[in-house]
Amino acid sequence: LAENLAAAFGRPAWDISFHVNMDAASLIGMDTFVDGAVTFRPGPVYRCAQCGGFGVLDEINMAKNEALAVLHAVLDFRRAIDVPGYERIPLAEETRFIATMNYGYAGTRELNEALTSRFAVIQMPTITEENLEKLLRAQFADLTDKYVHQFALLFLDLQKKCDSAEISTKALDLRGMLDALRLRRRGVAAGPALDM
């Protein structure tokens, strides 16, 4: 979705994948040596801000608050980046940031209110049976309608059980099911493929 929005607006996109070891320098940039001299190497948020691109802040709820604090001035009325030891750069007018996150995965947490308030939060609905079957047909054209329907029902049944707390949410992973189907293509039996 985020990449499609960038393409629709004709803007370059930076995919910034967050993790627990992410720090402010990873986002805005850091000093490095080039030909024996100290030079500033811009990070993805800095480059996105200069070019008027779309910054896709992927899995933003994996990062620590200290790393995310640099985004506050970027995302509010200031629309600027303070680069310690260098300068304050304004964001190009076209610059936009889109954050994505999944709940309930290991290492994720709730975002603090100061950061959340700088975004328009869109809760994505869960996939419908019809759309799941379309996705399966698009990804696996060799799958018969019978199996497309069975895998869609399997996923939706697991989803219902997760929603009612009958099973762990770890059992439900659309990406995992798609990977299992790819393994099936390579000859792995259905049971072991789903176990992986």
PLM region spans:
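AAA+ P-loop NTPase catalytic core and its hallmark functional loops
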Residues: 1-156, 163
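Conserved AAA+ ATPase small/helical "lid" subdomain
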Residues: 133-196
